[in-house]
Amino acid sequence: MTLFSSISSMSSSMTSSRSSFSSFGSGTSMGSNSIACSVGSGGGGCGSGSGGCGDLTGGAKSSGGSCGGKGGPHNHGHGNGHGPHGHGGKGSGGSCSC
């Protein structure tokens, strides 16, 4: 029962994160990428190189939404249709980018 309770509490916190993410940034609904960014970044909720949220080694893409992450000089970011492309040192430049 303890496990079930913690799963349902995590799920409700993710739902509330989704509604808050969709209310800022570029004005579009952020969907699952922003949630993965805030929950899976491993410290701080602003893309730290994990899960499609801006690669600190200058890798393939940033989320292009509210959690762009720092990224390297080659981190151009595809954006996945959720916001502006991130160029250079700062991911997408949304309200959660570091």
UniProtKB/Swiss-Prot annotation:
InterPro entries: HssA/B-related. It holds the Pfam family Coiled. Coiled coil: none annotated. Disulfide bonds: none annotated. Residues 73-88 have a biased composition (Basic residues). One of its GO terms (biological process) is sorocarp development. Residues 60-72, 89-98 have a biased composition (Gly residues). Residues 1-29, 60-98 are annotated as: Disordered. Belongs to the hssA/B family. This is HssA/B-like protein 33. It comes from Dictyostelium discoideum. The lineage of its organism: Eukaryota, Amoebozoa, Evosea, Eumycetozoa, Dictyostelia. The gene is hssl33.
